[in-house]
Amino acid sequence: MLTHLARTLSRQLTGLGRSSLCWFPHPGFLYRGLSALSVTPRLLVPGRAPSLQAPAPATFPQDRGSLLGQCQHLACLQPCAGMKTKSSLKRRCKNCFYVRRRGRLFVFCKTHPRHKQRQG
């Protein structure tokens, strides 16, 4: 069960790195996720009855405010355009331009960053 939890957490963290939003999770978020992994095995020790009381949540000085205060750092996320991978590249507007770098062909657009493409 512990290996399943570790795989799930690592898959979620790698998925965050590939997402189209550029953001870094709050340090408390990562600590709570990892502390949940370390708390779970103690509850599953053989020969010990599982307690009905939930483990106390980790407290951090910056998290003591309201729920709005805890999620305040999410409001400042700035989306960044990802790169589409295509076999044939096309200019999507008059401001798109081709660039050859590292042996690949790219399309960039300063007017519409969502037009970025990479030849794959």
From Swiss-Prot:
Keywords carried by this UniProt record:
Mitochondrion, Ribonucleoprotein, Ribosomal protein, Transit peptide
Query: Is the Ribosomal protein keyword given for this protein?
Result: yes
Q: Name one GO biological process term.
A: translation
What are the boundaries of the signal sequence?
A: none
Mention one GO molecular function: structural constituent of ribosome
Mostly located where?
mitochondrion
Q: Where, subcellularly, is it found?
A: Mitochondrion
Q: Which residues cross the membrane?
A: none
Disulfide topology: none
Give the CC-aspect GO terms.
Answer: mitochondrial large ribosomal subunit
Tell me which PROSITE patterns the record gives: RIBOSOMAL_L36
**UniProt record similarity statement:** Belongs to the bacterial ribosomal protein bL36 family.
Q: What PANTHER family does the record tag this protein with?
A: 39S RIBOSOMAL PROTEIN L36, MITOCHONDRIAL, LARGE RIBOSOMAL SUBUNIT PROTEIN BL36M
Question: What subunit structure does UniProt give?
Answer: Component of the mitochondrial ribosome large subunit (39S) which comprises a 16S rRNA and about 50 distinct proteins.
- Specify the protein name: Large ribosomal subunit protein bL36m
